[in-house]
Structure formats: structure tokens, C-alpha cells
Amino acid sequence: MGFTSYSGPASAFPGKGTWKDFDTIFNLNKPEMLQTGDSGEDVGRIYNAVKEAAKEVGVEERVIFCIIMQESTGNVGVGTTIDPGSHPTGGLMQAEKSPAFPGQHNLSQEQISSMVTAGTKHFKANLKQLDDQDTATTIYRALRLYNSGSIDESNLSDGQGATPSYVSDIANRLQGRTN
């Protein structure tokens, strides 16, 4: 199933009722994660790390995992990049101040969890900048902040120097679509 393009305000994006459950989304993406060089153990540890971070930080598992897939394709050894504000962003969620292990695989649970927790805390801070509600519209708005650091409420596909399709791509991933 191909990606559908969404744009406009958060209300124009698909509601939570269209989102697949975490296990379904995770299992649909396993083949893609394994193609990055991740071991089966790495993939299992990503699953555990998402569950842990969701419980510890208070962000939905499926949102955390879809950010991981959008940012790094689940590659535990993904390289560090530079965000629009010229800050290094690393790890599975490409978050500022996240631990990163470029080029490495077969990581420990602690290493993988550290990346997922750092990114999840960063996203939670974006949620708190808004109304910290567990609604699709707040999550979509926070995703725009996570990716670009700012938000045009009238058009979440205005990347303002970052990836324009970021929120739309994650909306698709939440519905079970893969690359």
C-alpha cells in the first residue's frame, strides 16, 4: 500500500481510529529493519526499548516506533546528522543529545534503550509545548515541532527548512504503511 499525501492543519490528518496497533506496525516493519544490518536481537531490543520508553515517558508506543522508522529505518547504527538549527542529532530517533552508535550493530539493550528514551523525552517535550494531550491532532502538531522546531498550524506540511512530508509520512506509518 503506497503512501497518501496529507497536508493542512492537524484536523486534516487521519484520526487515531485509522491507526494500526503497535504489534502490527512493528511486525510490518521488521523486514526493513533487518535490511539495515540490524541483527534479530537488535530488532527485539528496539521492541523492548519502545515498550519501556512508552511506559516511562508517557508517549504512545506506535508514535515512538513510527518516529524511529521515519528517522533511522530502525538502524541501530545510523549516523549522526545535523538539524536545521545546526545541532547534532543522533540515535534511532535522530534526537539532539541522544547517544548514538554509528556503524555498530548487535548493541546491548541498555544502548538501544538509551537512544529510544532520549528521543522519546525530546518528543514528550514537544507535546508539552502544546497541550500534552494524547490526541491525534496534538501528536501531529508535536511531530512537526520534533522535525522542524517550529509549526505552521495551518499547514503541517510546511517543513520550514526541514522535511515537508514528515508528519504525512508518519501518519501513513501509523496506518501500517511501509517504505
What are these regions (language model features)?
Residues 72:
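Glycine-rich His-Gly loop
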Residues 63-69, 91-95, 142-145:
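Structural recognition of the beta-strand scaffold that forms the well-ordered cores
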Residues 79-102:
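Short, surface-exposed glycine/acidic/tryptophan-bearing loops
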Residues 59-61:
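Helix N-cap / loop-to-helix initiation motif
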